[in-house]
A protein has these predicted regions:
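Domain-length accessory/inserted modules outside core catalytic folds
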Residues: 1-136
Length: 136
């Protein structure tokens, strides 16, 4: 299985970049996007501990919605990492549709700091949606 990761820097002046890892074990067999190695999650996020949370990309104008995993710096809040507005928005897009099922402070759970990666299977449909993210 192939995976596509978008590195989302906390610094909005830096561009979002895409990275593909090929021929990996699928999630149902215990696989996933690699943590170690070249372009692994630790390298892309620039940290030693990662928390994986659900996130989504939504483009209302294009009618696109893509659910995926957001790999975040787990220690970022403790070490004063910069707020990642773009990754926080992806967390918001995931949580907003279920707002009525969440606690009133649910938006606090959208706050992401440091560099992050949005990871999805590298299917043809997902690649097309991800291209629109990179073009925006």
């Amino acid at each position: 299985m192939d995976y596509l990761a978008l590195k989302i820097p906390a610094d909005t002046a830096e561009p979002i970049t895409s990275h593909i890892q090929k021929d990996l074990t699928p999630p149902e067999e215990g696989g996933g996007y690699p943590f170690k190695g070249e372009k692994g999650a630790y390298e892309l996020c620039g940290c030693d501990m990662i928390q994986i949370v659900p996130a989504a990309y939504t483009d209302v104008k294009r009618g696109q919605h893509l659910e995926g995993d957001l790999y975040c710096d787990e220690e970022g809040l403790m070490n004063g990492s910069q707020h990642n507005w773009r990754a926080s928005q992806m967390r918001y897009w995931h949580m907003k549709p279920q707002e009525d099922q969440l606690t009133p402070d649910w938006r606090e759970w959208c706050h992401i700091v440091g560099d992050a990666c949005f990871v999805v299977p590298a299917t043809d449909d997902n690649l097309k949606i991800m291209e629109s993210i990179l073009d925006s």
